[in-house]
Amino acid sequence: MKIAATFLAIHILALGLGMFGLISAVPNVAQFAGNPYALAFYSWAIVNTGTVDIWTGTLAMLAFGVASIGARRTLFFFLAATLISATAELTGTKTGWPFGGYEYTGFLGLKLAGRVPYTVPLSWFYMGFASFLLACKIVQTARVKNELLWSIVLGAWLLMAWDLVLDPAMASDKMTVMHFWVWKEHGPYFGMPLRNLAGSLGTGLVFIAAGRFAWMRPIDARRMAAWLPFGVYAANVIWAMALSLSVGLWPTALAAVALSLLPATFALRPARAGAPLPA
């Protein structure tokens, strides 16, 4: 667990550095012109900070998964999440289905097939895994019937709720210096097509279900150390909220509090004593 906590700390630091760069350094790059060291660091950070925070988030959740539910389950979920999300993204950037017409810029690292940054499936994994483990803890602690179904549905919802606040900001026209992707069509949700949200929810449902069914037996998440997946999830939602506020999208930031952060906090409730889950 110490390894996972270390990667979480680095992940949060990288997110903070990235946010500072986006809202302060990037719009004022001229201030570094007279300082070659600052300019060199800026040049490195603008290319690599996003990659660092995605990799550290991935490593934090991999380490947590191995420590909490075992290497086999963690590997199965990793493969399901990365392969299915990469397939969806490659299909989406070519055909416009299931997310709508869009293309990635060069700010998220090297691209698979020249279209999808290789870091994108990793972000699907670590946020999807965190969302699903939080959902398992919430559903099992509340002793909800049909635990398998509702943990998958809630996990996919928490993942999609992150998109509600992240995507409009990342592609906002007010991000005048750098965009992470560009929409080829206009939609009613702050410029995004609604099918992007449906595609995000559907992709999450598919890979979360695939990863979970590969486990065969359920996990008992009631006494899981939920603070770590919550830390990963909350850090990324708060980062997206800060970016949204920086470009004037306060409605999406408020939506993130109500639809993602508040529901996720229920995973921090202590578990009540009860019978073990069926094998």
Language-model features, listed with the residues they occupy:
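Aromatic-rich, lipid-facing transmembrane alpha helices and their immediate juxtamembrane interface loops
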Residues: 1-279
